[in-house]
Amino acid sequence: MGGIPSEQSPCALGCERQALVQVLRSYSQLVKPKIIALLLMTTAGAMWMAGNTDPFRFFITLLGGGIAAAAANVINMVYDTDIDRMMERTRHRPLPSGRIRARDALIFSGILALAAFGLLAIFTNLLAAGLAMSGILVYVGVYTHWLKRSSTQNIVIGGAAGAIPPLVGWAATTGELSWAAWVMFAIIFLWTPPHFWALAILKREDYARAGVPMLPVVAGERITAAQILLYALLMVPVSLLLVYPLGMLGSFYLSAAALLGSLLVWKAVQLLQDPCDRDRAASLFTFANLYLLLLCGAMGLDRWSLTHILWSQATASLQGIYTTLIALAS
């Protein structure tokens, strides 16, 4: 007489679900979702400024760009497994901890890259797809393979990869690259050193242990802080080029960019006053992330007509209050 098939116990099913969740969590950590979110904000900013009005194109561009960035991050993780094992900050990542095999990660990255190219090529255009692939090549080839372990300028030159997402967004919207797109590229390019060098000051011992020649390890915190201030000072006027002479954005963005840039420069000045102060380095790193998010958000808001109406009313009210106070004081 045939036996009755036994059902899996609730405990076994629970263990399987838990194992699946762990695998998904490991692959999620592999792609660095927080970094991708920041990169996609620059893509969105470029699309808003370029005048995108197609929600589907907007979604597909962010999806394809995010998948391309994920592919680059996975390949970088595979290549850097040896040094990640030496660093306290990274030794628990999926590859150095053994939760994911390098071969599986490479297959995953290949699937991601093909998916990104296909999505962008089919639903936007070949220029956007090609730019996304070039971002992977620059990040992996120039930064990870060539410069990261050999030069203090690794994140400066290699930072060009992180500046490509706004080009992808612009190309997906317009089918070409204008001066405004390249100004956005320059903003991200100049933003990268203050952002990563602030983190490198915080993790200096980790990088030194792994033999990675980050600027604070080789040149010290003071020179690094001076370089951070230099790049911050360069970035502020570049960010204003979108207002004049390009005329892409208006007074709302101008005010936001000037305020955010001034705050970033002030954070850099504070760090230069005491380059070994970890709290100041952490504050600069955190604000650098916030700066980029808010700057790109200001680009989108500036393209919204209601923003200019409200902004004009607010500035007129402030001017009226100022005039009244002057009259009362005289």
Curated annotation (Swiss-Prot):
Keywords for this protein? Cell inner membrane, Cell membrane, Heme biosynthesis, Membrane, Transferase, Transmembrane, Transmembrane helix
Q: Which Pfam families match?
A: UbiA
- Name any Gene Ontology BP term: heme O biosynthetic process
Q: Where in the cell is it found?
A: Cell inner membrane
List other remarks.
Carbon 2 of the heme B porphyrin ring is defined according to the Fischer nomenclature.
InterPro entries, from UniProt? Protohaem_IX_farnesylTrfase (IPR006369), UbiA_prenyltransferase (IPR000537), UbiA_prenylTrfase_CS (IPR030470), UbiA_sf (IPR044878)
Q: What does this protein do?
A: Converts heme B (protoheme IX) to heme O by substitution of the vinyl group on carbon 2 of heme B porphyrin ring with a hydroxyethyl farnesyl side group.
Q: Which GO terms describe its molecular function?
A: protoheme IX farnesyltransferase activity
The name this protein carries in UniProt is: Protoheme IX farnesyltransferase
Q: EC?
A: 2.5.1.141
To which species is this protein native?
A: Synechococcus sp. (strain JA-2-3B'a(2-13))
* GO terms for cellular component: plasma membrane
- Catalysis: reaction(s): heme b + (2E,6E)-farnesyl diphosphate + H2O = Fe(II)-heme o + diphosphate
Homology family: Belongs to the UbiA prenyltransferase family. Protoheme IX farnesyltransferase subfamily.
Q: Give the pathway.
A: Porphyrin-containing compound metabolism; heme O biosynthesis; heme O from protoheme: step 1/1
Q: Where does it mainly reside?
A: membrane
Its placement in the membrane is given as: Multi-pass membrane protein
What parts of the sequence cross the membrane? Answer: 30-50, 58-78, 106-126, 127-147, 155-175, 182-202, 228-248, 249-269, 281-301
